[in-house]
A protein has these predicted regions:
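Non-catalytic peripheral regions of nucleotide-handling enzymes
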Residues: 1-87
Length: 87
């Protein structure tokens, strides 16, 4: 069953490559090495609002253990979070 979290759950990114894509991250007490990047995109919402916008950089990837997931970097909080995990 696919699980998703609109605001994401915290992950610990241990390393990023030259393009800023995670090459390893920690989640739920386990280390995950990234096998392959599938897709990358950016989203900016509410750019017109006085209180500011939310800007995120998303990556869909597969880990070496076969976990298919979507992570995002939140430019406002400077944190990496996991948004979705596919079964």
């Amino acid at each position: 069953m696919t699980k998703s979290w609109a605001d994401g759950l915290p992950v610990r990114v241990e390393a990023v490559d030259a393009q800023g894509v995670p090459s390893a991250f920690g989640w739920q007490g386990q280390a995950h090495a990234v096998e392959r990047l599938l897709q990358r995109w950016e989203v900016e919402t509410d750019w017109w609002a006085e209180e500011g916008s939310a800007r995120r950089s998303y990556v869909a990837l597969i880990t070496r253990t076969g976990l298919l997931c979507v992570l995002f970097f939140d430019f406002g909080t400077t944190e990496w979070r996991i948004a979705r995990v596919y079964d």
